[in-house]
Amino acid sequence: MAGTSLGTRFYRQIKRHPGLIPMIGFICLGMGSAGLYLLRLALRSPDVCWDRKNNPEPWNRLSPNDQYKFLAVSTDYKKLKKDRPDF
């Protein structure tokens, strides 16, 4: 057992306990979804600033028509009018 690789040991455990397959599948699905959501937050959120020199306040560049929420149930962003001053 000392010379076996990690993949071989993993395969043996899966072969002995097939009930682990759905659990491993759901764990991988959850980790993948969490990773994709973090990537979406990092790239699309107006609160995240990757370039402080050229864009120190990215939230001031948003127009009222920009939808940055993940899900907007009752708000139609295309009909909103601009009611804030430009900075």
From Swiss-Prot:
The lineage of its organism: Eukaryota, Metazoa, Chordata, Craniata, Vertebrata. This is NADH dehydrogenase [ubiquinone] 1 alpha subcomplex subunit 4-like 2. The gene is Ndufa4l2. Pfam families: B12D (PF06522). InterPro entries: B12D. Belongs to the complex I NDUFA4 subunit family. It comes from the Eukaryota. It comes from Mus musculus (Mouse). PANTHER family: NADH DEHYDROGENASE [UBIQUINONE] 1 ALPHA SUBCOMPLEX SUBUNIT 4-LIKE 2 (PTHR14256:SF5), NADH-UBIQUINONE OXIDOREDUCTASE MLRQ SUBUNIT (PTHR14256).
